[in-house]
Amino acid sequence: MKSRGLSVSTTNEHPDSQRLLADPLAGSESWWQQIAQWGTPLVEPISEDKVRLTFLWREPVAGADEPTYSRVYIDVNGVTDHHSTHPETLQRLGQTHVWYWQAEVESDFRGSYSFMPVTAEHCLNLPEGTPQERRQAQRNWWISLMDLAQNDPFNHTAPHSSYRGRPLSAVHLADAIPQTAWQPIDAGQQLPTDTQRLQLITWHSELLGNSRNVWIYHTHGTEDNAERPLAILLDGQYWATRQPIFGVLDNETDAGRLPASVYVLIDIIDQPHRSVELPCNQDFWQALQTELLPQVAALQPFTDQASRTVVAGQSFGWVGLAICRITLAAAFWWCAESSPVPSGGRMLIISKL
C-alpha cells in the first residue's frame, strides 16, 4: 500500500470506545449519524505515544439481493499481516449491523486500510499440504479477496486506490510527519500536471526481451541540469496515471522541500512481469542501468552521483530497490515467515538471500 498526509489529523478522537460499543442505541440510525460526524477510525490516546484505533463497518440491511456476511476481514498497512493463516477480522456487535475492530498503534502512524466482507464460501479454509503449498494457497485466497475490498465511507479523507485498483481509505494521526503537498488530493481535489515537462517514452529492452512505458518528469530549479538528482519510481504506472504525483512533486519543489530533480516512473507491464522482475532479479537492474538510464539522460540530464540518486518502491518494489542496493554485497538478510518473532520485538535478521 500508499501513505499520504495532511498537516492535521484526519481522524477524530472519541474518549471511550467501550462505552460507545456498549451504548444500547449502538447500530441505530442516530448512532451511525454520530459516527459519520466524528469520522472513522475513532482515536483514543492510551499513553503519551500510543493510541487505540476503532474501525467500524456498517453491514447493509439484508435484502433479496444482499448476501449474508460471515466475516469482515481488515487489511491495515503495516499493522495487520496479510500472510497470516489467521487474518484479522472485525467482530459483530451483538445482533446489530455494527462490525468493529481495534488496534493499538504509535501516535505518529500513517497508513491505508480496507474492509473485505465475505460470505461463508469465501472464508479462509486452507487445504492439507506442505508449508509451501499452504502459503501459496493462502496467497491465492488473499488475492481473490481484492475484488471484494471496500473503502471506509465514514472516513473523512477522500478514498484512493492501490496499484491493483483496490479501494482504500487512509489514517493520518496527529503526530504523523506533515505531508502537506498531499492535502488537496486527500480533500478529493486534483493537482494539475505541467505536460510540457512530462515525457512518455517506450523502453524496448533487449536484455529483458520486452517493452514498456516510462514517464520522465523534471521539476523547475536553478541547478545545472547535469547535477540534478535522479529519482526512480517503481510501479510507475500507478504514480503516473492512477494517482498522478507530478503536481505533488511541483508543490514540494516550489516549497523548497525537494531539489529540482529528474523523475523516472517505470511501468510494470503487468502483474506476472512485476512478480518476476522486481524481487531479486539482477537482469532487471542491469537493463535499467545499461539501457534505460542512458536514454533518460539523453532527454533529461541528471547527476551520476549515487548519493543523489533515489529508488522508491513498495512491496515487491521495496524488495527490488533493496536488491538494487545490495547487488554487489556478499550477503543480504531478510525475515522468513516461518521464523518466530521475539515477544515485544521485531525480527531483524533471519534468513540469507
From Swiss-Prot:
- Sorted UniProt keywords: Cytoplasm, Hydrolase
Report the sequence similarity comment from the record: Belongs to the Fes family.
Q: Which organism is it from?
A: Yersinia enterocolitica
EC class (word): hydrolase
Q: Name one Pfam family in it.
A: Enterochelin_N
Q: Does the keyword Nucleotidyltransferase apply?
A: no
Compartment list: Cytoplasm
Q: What is the role of this chain?
A: Catalyzes the hydrolysis of ferric enterobactin (Fe-Ent). Is responsible for the release of iron from ferric enterobactin.
Protein name as catalogued:
Iron(III) enterobactin esterase
Which SUPFAM superfamilies does the entry link to? alpha/beta-Hydrolases, E set domains
